[in-house]
């Protein structure tokens, strides 16, 4: 299991700041040691790192994992009994929860609170939402197969397809009657801070609750405005008035308006409503204020709700009031997860894509902590930093004595060290309602300026004037914005790709992420000619683009190719300012052409509205099938294919290998054997012919 992020994330330190996915070690003897709870030096981490896990979950500040022996491992924060082990002391490394030694745990879920499900469908609960240090057994009417939870919110689904809500804070589970009354079977569930998601066995998605994360925002306000207009304009007709009043009453049963403290209107959907835009959905996930749905037919993801921190992976919008496609045309997605403010996808090839992050507002210097890694990761989570004290404030007024980044050590920094700084996101509100006092930590800044010079640093004079100017430059708002643009877009975790680690499943918490490798290491697929063309064009754009008007021929590319080039540059984090502008221009030009022509043509090129539709298959028709096959083989640098005498490879074979129908190594072995046999047969034939010729010569000599 890999874990990275910030906080108490099981790597042996009281606080960690891990930017690259790092293996966790699991050791049973850790549960017996006392020093693992020490606030002092780091604990030496020993144990197994290749344990197989059947389920795991990253919570708000702690994590749970179930191994293949059905043992429950816990690590992280434990100030609110998150461990369920009759203790309030945290652990720097994973330890076993011995409360379940007599139970066979098969599934877990956690956030502030924790849940464990047994093989019999029994549910154990413990943590912040209840007044107990050890797990308590919940009373469900039916055996439960899955539970999801968020900040002070929980939802479950039984094996027979009944959804349950309202079982946090010592409350008893309540079935959602709407689905029972309408004979709708629920397959899986998810929840955020204020909303619920339900996935049916027919691939449809329902939602209820409050906010734009339900996906019904536009529908609600359109209906509300229409009802008000009808009530104002139909006073002359009693029948119409009655009808309108009935409609209004009906709406109130389904949707309810709530007045917030600021006087703003907010809606709350009482009865679950179907999201009509979504079909063929196979998985759902929810962040605090956003939602995700995986389309099993397209292998693509839809997202809606809040996008202030890039958790939807869509650049240029703060919110989406309805489900919209997160365009990733180069990959096929098989698994999704959404944390508080960031999300992660796993592709069919086992690649991990991560996006988003949390942003905490601070009037002081902002310290950024990466959720990913330097190459293909990003630096988005930001904590408040008190520059007069050697401590970091991370939510709920909790002060940690150990800093988690060299940025807050600048007062005692060695003069010989390089002044490394990090780009951070533009300063925005993150509505971090989960930590009720995240935005009220100003008590620690009253005396910040007492011992500082005009540059903002105390009189120790560690930084030179030049270094200070550079420091200030890297932390101005313009730099924040420029450095953060790519961070709102989905990105590969490059360290996993480089090490050929195939990911099977991922779970996003608040400040950290967990991921497990696949039990079956996939064979790297042969890259198609299309993929090589995409990479070739992308590299040329980055390496040879001197001005914004470079590459005039790119305007003739089909829009699907443009989208794939943009996706390649984005996922691999290769975009430059010019390439981003070029891609934005090409995409907007295509949309403008479509609008100008009123959809009366079939153009799929960027600036050629009258041209015919181009697809990759049509491009390749200009060449023979042998050309495509040879091009793929050559570009993949498969030496054995080009050097083996008599070896032939067809387009059908290439397609079969690419699609996984034929295992490449097996094909090579069989073909090589056939070629070798063929060569042996040829040698035998030649020897026989030579012998025959010799005999003929001898006979002729005798006759003479």
Swiss-Prot record:
Coiled-coil stretches are 668-698
**Entry's SUPFAM superfamilies?**
RCC1/BLIP-II
Renumbered residue ranges of the record's region Disordered: 221-246, 412-458
- Source organism of the structure: Dictyostelium discoideum
- This chain belongs to which protein, by name? RCC1 domain-containing protein DDB_G0295713
**UniProt keyword annotations, A-Z:** Coiled coil, Repeat
Q: Does the keyword Methyltransferase apply?
A: no
Positions with biased composition (Low complexity): 222-246
| InterPro entries in UniProt | RCC1/BLIP-II (IPR009091), Reg_chr_condens (IPR000408), Ub_ligase/GEF_domain (IPR051210)
- Provide the leader sequence positions: none
RCC1 repeat positions: 1-48, 69-120, 298-348
Sequence ranges of Acidic residues compositional bias: 432-451
Annotated transmembrane regions: none
The residue ranges flagged as biased composition, category Basic and acidic residues, are 412-431
In terms of Gene3D superfamilies, this protein maps to: Regulator of chromosome condensation 1/beta-lactamase-inhibitor protein II (2.130.10.30)
């Amino acid at each position: 299991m890999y874990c990275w992020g910030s906080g108490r994330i099981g790597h042996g330190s009281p606080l960690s700041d891990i930017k690259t996915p790092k293996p966790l070690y699991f050791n049973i003897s850790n549960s017996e040691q006392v020093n693992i709870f020490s606030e002092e030096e780091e604990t030496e981490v020993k144990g197994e790192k290749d344990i197989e896990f059947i389920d795991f979950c990253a919570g708000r500040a702690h994590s749970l994992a179930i191994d293949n022996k059905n043992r429950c491992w816990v690590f992280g924060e434990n100030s609110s009994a998150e461990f369920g082990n009759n203790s309030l002391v945290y652990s720097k490394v994973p330890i076993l929860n011995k409360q379940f030694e007599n139970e066979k745990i098969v599934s877990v879920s956690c956030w502030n609170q924790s849940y464990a499900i047994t093989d019999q469908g029994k549910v154990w609960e413990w943590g912040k939402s209840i007044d107990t240090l050890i797990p308590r057994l919940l009373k469900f009417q039916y055996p439960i197969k899955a539970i999801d939870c968020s900040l002070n919110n929980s939802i479950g689904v039984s094996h027979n397809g009944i959804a349950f809500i309202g079982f946090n804070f010592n409350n008893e589970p309540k079935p959602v009657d709407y689905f029972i009354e309408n004979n709708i079977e629920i397959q899986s569930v998810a929840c955020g801070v204020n909303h619920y998601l339900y996935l049916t066995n027919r691939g449809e998605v329902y939602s209820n609750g409050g906010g734009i994360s339900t996906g019904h925002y536009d529908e609600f306000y359109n209906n509300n405005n229409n009802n008000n207009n009808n009530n104002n304009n139909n006073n002359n007709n009693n029948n119409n008035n009655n009808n309108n009043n009935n409609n209004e009453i009906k709406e109130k049963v389904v949707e309810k308006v709530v007045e917030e403290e600021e006087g703003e209107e907010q809606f709350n959907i009482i009865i679950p409503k179907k999201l009509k835009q979504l079909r063929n959905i196979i998985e759902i996930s929810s962040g605090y204020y956003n939602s995700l749905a995986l389309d099993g037919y397209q292998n693509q993801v839809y997202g809606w709700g809040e996008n202030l921190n890039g958790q939807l992976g869509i650049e240029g919008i703060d919110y989406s009031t309805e489900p919209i496609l997160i365009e990733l045309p180069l990959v096929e997605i098989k698994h999704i997860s959404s944390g508080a403010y960031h999300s992660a996808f796993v592709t069919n090839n086992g690649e991990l894509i991560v996006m988003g992050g949390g942003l905490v507002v601070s009037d002081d210097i902002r310290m950024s902590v990466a959720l990913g890694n330097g190459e293909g990761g990003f630096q988005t989570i930001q904590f408040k930093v008190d520059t007069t004290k050697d401590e970091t404030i991370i939510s709920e007024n909790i002060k940690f004595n150990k800093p988690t980044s060299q940025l807050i050590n600048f007062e005692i920094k060695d003069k010989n060290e390089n002044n490394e700084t990090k780009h951070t996101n533009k300063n925005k509100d993150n509505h971090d309602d989960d930590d009720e006092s995240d935005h009220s930590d100003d008590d620690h800044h009253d005396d910040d300026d007492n011992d500082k010079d005009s540059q903002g640093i105390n009189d120790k004079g560690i930084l030179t004037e030049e270094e200070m100017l550079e420091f200030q430059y890297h932390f101005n708002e313009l730099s924040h914005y420029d450095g953060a643009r790519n961070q709102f877009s989905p990105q590969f975790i490059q360290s996993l790709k480089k090490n050929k680690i195939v990911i099977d499943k991922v779970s996003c918490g608040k400040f950290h992420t967990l991921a497990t490798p696949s039990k079956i290491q996939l064979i790297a697929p042969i890259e198609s000619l299309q993929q090589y063309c995409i990479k070739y064009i992308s590299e040329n754009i980055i390496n040879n683009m001197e001005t914004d008007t470079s590459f005039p021929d790119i305007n003739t590319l089909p829009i699907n190719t443009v989208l794939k080039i943009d996706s390649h540059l984005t996922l691999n984090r290769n975009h430059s300012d010019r390439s981003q502008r070029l891609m934005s221009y090409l995409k907007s030009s295509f949309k403008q052409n479509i609008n100008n022509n009123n959809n009366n043509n079939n153009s799929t090129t960027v600036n050629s509205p009258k041209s015919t539709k181009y697809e990759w298959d049509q491009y390749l028709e200009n060449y023979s099938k042998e050309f495509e096959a040879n091009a793929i083989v050559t570009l993949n640098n498969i030496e054995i294919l080009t050097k083996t005498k008599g070896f032939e490879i067809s387009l059908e074979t290439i397609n079969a290998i690419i699609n996984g129908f034929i295992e490449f190594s097996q094909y090579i072995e069989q073909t090589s054997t056939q070629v070798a046999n063929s060569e042996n047969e040829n040698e035998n034939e030649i020897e026989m012919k030579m012998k025959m010729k010799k005999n003929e010569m001898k006979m002729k000599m005798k006759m003479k």
